[in-house]
C-alpha cells in the first residue's frame, strides 16, 4: 500500500534530485564525472568504482503527486548496500535517440546500511531531460548510475550545532545529514532546518522531517517557508527566507557552528552566493555574509 511505502521513508532509503534540475547541472555533472571525490572499491557495495556505470532495474513506480514519483531500484545483489556515505551523491545517465549522453547528479538520502534496493523520490521539471526520462521509466527498465561522489564526510559531533538552509529539491543532502545525525545516539549535534518551497504541497519529505523533529525535540528545530498558502490552514512561514529571520534564528558565527546550504540559484544568491564549481565553493556573499559569517563557516552543496 502507498501508506506503507511512504512510512518507509522514516528510515530513509530515498534519493531525490540534487539541487534541482537546472542548466547548471549539466556542467556540474561533467565535472563530477572526472573528479577524484570517489570512494575506493569495496566488496558488498554496488557503487564503488568512479569509472563504472552500473545499470539498475526499476522494480516499483508509485505516483505520489502529479509531478512526483517514488521509484525503487534493485541493487546489483540483494545483500549489497549502496556504498554511499553521508554526504554523497550519485551520477545518473541515459543516452538520447541522437546518441547524446545526459548526465545529472542526484543526492541520496538512503540509510547507508540499507541492502538490496535503493529508492528515489523524483520530481519532474518542465524541460528537465533527466527528470522527465526517469519519471517515464517503466518497471523492468534500467537506469545507469555511477559514484558515489563524496561532498562532505560527516563525523559525529563535528560541531555543537548546525543550520541546514534549503529550497526545493535541495533538501536532499540536508535531509541526509539530518537523518544521519539523529540516527546516531552518540551524535549530539543540534540541527536547525530552514526549508523553503513554493507551496505546502511542494515540500518533499515533510512527514519524515516532522517525524524526526517530533522524536528529537531537544535536538532538532524545523522552519518551513512557502511562497503562497492558505493562511487559515498553514502554520509555517509565508514569504522568502530573509536576513532578519536568519539573524533571529542562527547562532553567532564560530568554529562550533556550521551552516550548510543547498537549493536553486536564487536561494544561493540570497543566502550565501553561488559555487564556482563542484570543487570551488566561491566567495561567501548574501545574507550570511551580511550577518558576519566567513567562508569557513559555510558549506554549499
From Swiss-Prot:
Name the GO cellular-component terms. mitochondrial outer membrane
Q: Name one Pfam family in it.
A: FAD_binding_6
Which terms in the Gene Ontology molecular function aspect does this entry carry?
A: cytochrome-b5 reductase activity, acting on NAD(P)H
Per the record, the domain of life is: Eukaryota
Task: Tell me which residues bind FAD.
Answer: 158-193
All copies of the FAD-binding FR-type domain together span: 51-155
Q: What is its EC number?
A: 1.6.2.2
Name the needed cofactors. FAD
Question: What InterPro entries does the database record attribute to this sequence?
Answer: CBR-like, Cbr1-like_FAD-bd_dom, FAD-bd_FR_type, Flavoprot_Pyr_Nucl_cyt_Rdtase, FNR_nucleotide-bd, OxRdtase_FAD/NAD-bd, Riboflavin_synthase-like_b-brl
Q: Name one GO biological process term.
A: ergosterol biosynthetic process
Which controlled-vocabulary keywords does the entry list? FAD, Flavoprotein, Membrane, Mitochondrion, Mitochondrion outer membrane, NAD, Oxidoreductase, Transmembrane, Transmembrane helix
Q: How does it sit in the membrane?
A: Single-pass membrane protein
The first-level EC class reads oxidoreductase
Primary location:
mitochondrion
As for subcellular location, the record says: Mitochondrion outer membrane
Q: Which reaction does it catalyse?
A: 2 Fe(III)-[cytochrome b5] + NADH = 2 Fe(II)-[cytochrome b5] + NAD(+) + H(+)
Sequence intervals crossing the membrane: 14-30
**What is stated as this protein's family in its record?**
Belongs to the flavoprotein pyridine nucleotide cytochrome reductase family.
Q: What does this protein do?
A: May mediate the reduction of outer membrane cytochrome b5.
In Swiss-Prot or TrEMBL terms, this protein is called NADH-cytochrome b5 reductase 2
What is the protein's species of origin?
Candida albicans (strain SC5314 / ATCC MYA-2876)
